[in-house]
Amino acid sequence: MKIISVGDLHGRDVAEDARGLIGQCDKMIFMGDYVDSFEHTDQQILDCLRTVIDLKKEYPEKVVLLWGNHDIQYLLGHKRHGCSGYRPQMDLMLYTEFTCHRDLFQLAFQHKDWIWTHAGIHDGWWLFSFKYNMGFTNIAAELNFAFDKKEEALFDVGHRRGGYKDVGGPLWCDRLELLNKPLEGYNQVVGHNKREFIERARWKELEIVFVDALHNDDKFVYHISNFKDE
């Protein structure tokens, strides 16, 4: 199993690069935040979102589209889920795009002991804030089920990101929060935290890969995970 992880897009045109790689992997996971930008135009942002939606429709089993916090403010409302870069003139347009294609997106993806979310899962958040135990054996399945139910803890914003919670949930968790105590027993791939280059960090025996490095616009940056599947 070869998985390509692509960091936060924020309106960037990645159509040619993504299509050039899609045949070289088993999964291509986009880490969310397709919208909002201080550099790109409204039309570029809309084109970016429609590009990944088209990719998902064309390769439904191969492409994974994760939700990001910037996407949520249009899907569920800026007043409750607002963040920087909000474009009021695009609110209705992006709400319509996300709502009409909601089933193409998900909060989390899991392969073996690796979990992909936009911002990461903090162990304390999982144990003491989320507490949404529905008997799932798959962490991602439980998170996706909870998202469909709009479980409030999923949208927690920690102090480091200007919120009132001790730590953020999987849409808002800050890098330093995550590195302090990531979810026990699982490696993670996350976006959300801008890095100059893709960063591989370790916490005890666990690995956390930060892939939000696409702001280096001179090249298409992505991370490859290779798994030996039985």
Where are these regions (language model features)?
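Short, conserved loop/helix-junction motifs that constitute active-site signature segments
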Residues: 22, 57-59, 181, 201-204
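A general structural motif
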Residues: 1, 23-26, 60-62, 112, ...
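PAPS-dependent sulfotransferase catalytic domain
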Residues: 88-117
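Core catalytic region of metal-dependent phosphoesterases/phosphodiesterases
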Residues: 6, 11-97
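Active-site environment of divalent metal-dependent phosphoester hydrolases
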Residues: 10-15, 36-39, 70-76, 122-124, ...
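Active-site-proximal loop/helix segment associated with metal-binding centers of metalloenzymes
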Residues: 106-181
